[in-house]
Amino acid sequence: MDAGDRVFEARYYGKCAFGAHGQGDCIQKLESEDCLYLNIWVNTDDKTEKKPVMVWIHGGSYIMGSGSQTSYNGANLVQKQSDIILVTINYRLNMYGFMDFSSVPGGEKFGTAPCNGLLDQATALRWVHENIAAFGGDPGNVTIFGQSAGGGSVSILPVLKQANKYFQKVIAQSGSTGLAFPVNSETAQGKTKALIEYTGCKNMDEIMALSEEDLQKAYVEAVSKFTSCPYYGTEVLPEAPIELYKKGYAKGITIMAGSTADEARLFMGEGVDLTLEEQKLFAQRAVGDAVPYVKEEDKKYYEEFRRVCRFQEPGLIETELIDDLMFRVPMLQQLDVQSAFDKTFCYYWSYPSSNADMGAAHSVELLFVFDLRGVGTSSVFNGTNISDEIFNATQQMWTNFARCGNPSTDEIEWKPYSVDDQNVMVIAGPGDIRMEKGLLAEQYKAVLPLLKYYQFMDKFFTPGYLADILAAREQGSQLRW
């Protein structure tokens, strides 16, 4: 948009980042490097002055998604919670948003590239801070919230000096500081090497001269096999985010965070709905192939996890380990550290989809946060148990936190989380929303020393596993590993 005082008729969603449509339900179909747009939902019938502002940062593994997905339509939320302003944003994805060029001649000029996507988010937050009052919002009462990669983003932004002055509260859904990898990792350097080898470019000038079409082809054919995420040990993130939390970089920010009971079930089929038995086979092979990366002195923690796991059935044990390593344990570690500086709140979502094979899978709570009844964007949402009680309680808790930093409602007292108290709000179903102390605490203790292996998690989802499972399904045979 050109600078100036003219009125801009914002009747259509702005373009999405390259890769956005991997998520599948983006309303805007155009992708471009010109993608830094945001959307604002305001209930104009509500005359509340200085409305609380909630800024949504989308997920999608840092490779897909946008703020204009059907899943994040804010109309129902601001209709029911009329004093809330909702903002959803775009940011650069995959190699456009998260790429290290330090090993490429001329790459020293691109020191922010490993975290450009985070800086895009920071820029959006600055825009909200400077302009939201014109829409009736309070720039001094801003909550950032996100899920999956969005949950990782809102967990990292509190330690980012370019961002943390623009918000006061965080809701991290199924994402944590663990969603940042070291810049010298195989994942980070492998992406750069793949781009160089595929394009034949010898320096940054040649890379910058590539057309959008050439870059997209290189991404699809070579770079996409590597995980995308923010990288630390860089100009933007000098240390691992959890280490910056320990130093008090996020002091003054109140955080609410949680995970679902069956996170990994969404990922195992890679877009194909697997039965529970097929998921268990997938998890057994994935964890079995990852165990060799664990040092001998750390294998005792893996054995301890198997002993204390809430499941004792092969396949479910491994699925739970993936859930804990990727989501629940790094989230709890983050809350443990931050609770020394500010109030923190924790939840555990176990209310399942009526799709029994999916359970309470990754993303299931989005239906209730945004009130997506009838949207049906994935197997997690389709057929999800519909409960007005859970819809109303979820939205009230989330928006109360945005209003005042406390998610309690008139009916539900939500106690803060701390290392000593370990209070967790369990959202299990109608008539079963309750506080628990020390939920799955033994699992947490067993997995915490294994978080150093988090960066190998992408090895848990090797496409060959799925191909073998589907071949066995086609042949009607039993697959054993």
Each predicted region: which residue ranges?
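Accessory cap/linker subdomain of secreted extracellular hydrolases
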Residues: 193-221
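Generic recognition of stable, solvent-exposed alpha-helical segments in well-folded globular domains
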Residues: 72, 116, 120-123, 148-149, ...
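K/E-rich alpha-helical interaction surfaces of small helical-bundle regulatory domains
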Residues: 123-131, 395-408
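Surface-exposed patches in mature extracellular/periplasmic domains of secreted proteins
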Residues: 140-142, 202-210, 315, 346-348, ...
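Non-catalytic accessory segments of hydrolases
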Residues: 1-118, 139, 376-394, 405-413, ...
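Serine-hydrolase-like catalytic core of hydrolytic proteins
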Residues: 25-204, 244-268, 339
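Short, solvent-exposed turn/loop segments enriched in Gly/Ser/Thr/Pro and often Arg
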Residues: 92-94, 145-149, 348-356, 413-419
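Substrate-gating cap/lid region and adjacent catalytic-acid/histidine neighborhood
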Residues: 169, 212-388, 397, 404, ...
